From Swiss-Prot:
InterPro entries, per database record: ATP-grasp, ATP_grasp_subdomain_1, Glut_synth_pro, GSHS_ATP-bd, GSHS_N, PreATP-grasp_dom_sf
One Pfam assignment: GSH-S_N
Entry note: cofactor: Binds 1 Mg(2+) or Mn(2+) ion per subunit.
Cofactor: Mg(2+); Mn(2+)
Name listed for the protein in its UniProt record: Glutathione synthetase
UniProt-recorded Gene Ontology molecular function terms: ATP binding; glutathione synthase activity; metal ion binding
Family, as annotated: Belongs to the prokaryotic GSH synthase family.
Catalytic activity: gamma-L-glutamyl-L-cysteine + glycine + ATP = glutathione + ADP + phosphate + H(+)
UniProt keyword annotations, A-Z: ATP-binding, Glutathione biosynthesis, Ligase, Magnesium, Manganese, Metal-binding, Nucleotide-binding
UniProt lineage: Bacteria, Pseudomonadati, Pseudomonadota, Gammaproteobacteria, Legionellales
Enzyme class, UniProt record, top EC level: ligase
Residues in coiled coil: none
Residues bound to Mg(2+): 282, 284
The protein's Enzyme Commission number: 6.3.2.3
Length: 321
């Protein structure tokens, strides 16, 4: 089966191919003889009732000196594609939300979109953990300064993070006696006008913030533990963390069993769970990464498995709701 697959992503010229999961997917698509088309968010638009895309044929090579080649662009109905992979990175802002509306309309016109646009919109990567409280650390979401201060007093050590960012951006670690608590809260909440998430600090982050990839709700049997650099508590590769491949623990598998069926039901077919110690901290649905690092450390073709799943899913899907 040869599919026409669109990949909606941030500019390909700016990616670091050795650690880019979207690039791993592109290599796998090409290896399986699919036609790959490249789009950026601004390439998708609504004209009257049709969703159109300015798309270019894309060829890729695992070569850091020249990793892509693009044809001239053509404007076509988006549903001229068979499948579209939505791989736009956060921030999760209103531009992202509007893009999911366009993709949802394209879906109704016959395009198979992965992950499902309505679920990308609904499943905020921080807030979605609230559906699984038995898996998470003590958590608070609020814009109220007094409520945040009370939570910090109760938990002694917390992290506070925005709901729409990525890669460890604007995450603060606070202790109960930190003199900066008021200014951090005021800044993060925009003086009480913006919701933020606070979670009990998990000391095991020093041993690694684990990323687990799930395909159709089933975990890859390995995790990428991202170990924070000295002097930092954030286990993000973009912040200098070191990636170390490990096998899943029994607790990791248990958390995946709790979350996986809901992901499958929502059409969230490619997801990255973040687990620190024994606790689920985030559910990454927009453009989870970690595949290239895991494939380099273990004899596993995660991107190939995902594309094989897409082929089967597309072949058996006759009515995309």
């Amino acid at each position: 089966m040869n599919l026409k697959v669109g990949v909606l992503m941030d500019p390909i010229a700016n990616i670091a191919i050795h650690k880019d999961t979207t690039f791993a997917m592109l290599l796998a698509l090409q290896a399986r003889q699919h036609e790959v088309y490249y789009l950026e968010p601004a390439d998708i638009f609504l004209r009257n009732e049709k969703i159109l895309g300015s798309m270019r044929r894309l060829q890729v090579a695992d070569d850091p000196s020249q990793w892509f080649n693009l044809s001239e662009s053509e404007i076509k109905p988006l549903h001229a594609l068979d499948v579209l992979l939505m791989r736009k990175d956060p921030p999760f802002n209103m531009s992202y939300v509007y893009l999911t509306y366009l993709l949802e309309l394209a879906e109704k016109q016959g395009l198979f979109v992965v992950n499902k646009p309505a679920s990308l919109r609904d499943a905020n990567e921080k807030l979605f953990t609230g559906w699984f409280p038995h898996c998470t650390p003590k958590t608070l979401v609020t814009s109220r300064k007094a409520i945040l201060q009370e939570f910090i007093r109760e938990q002694k050590e917390v992290v506070i993070k925005p709901l729409g960012a990525m890669a460890g951006e604007s995450i603060f670690y606070l202790t109960v006696n930190d003199p900066n608590i008021p200014v951090v809260i005021e800044t993060m909440t925009a003086n009480g006008h913006q919701l933020v998430m606070a979670q009990r600090f998990i000391p095991e982050v020093k041993s690694g913030d684990k990323r687990i990839i799930l395909i159709d709700g089933e975990p890859i049997p390995y995790t990428l533990a991202r170990i924070p650099p000295k002097g930092d508590f954030r286990g993000n590769l973009a912040r200098g963390a070191k990636g170390e491949g490990r096998e899943l623990t029994d607790r990791d598998r248990w958390i995946c069993e709790q979350v996986g069926p809901t992901l499958r039901k929502k059409g969230l077919w490619f997801v990255g769970l973040d687990i620190i110690g024994d606790y689920l901290t985030e559910i990454n649905v927009t453009s989870p990464t970690g595949v290239r690092e895991l494939q380099a450390q273990f004899d596993v073709d995660i991107a190939g498995q995902f594309i094989a799943f897409l082929e089967t899913k597309y072949a058996t899907t006759t009515d995309i709701e």
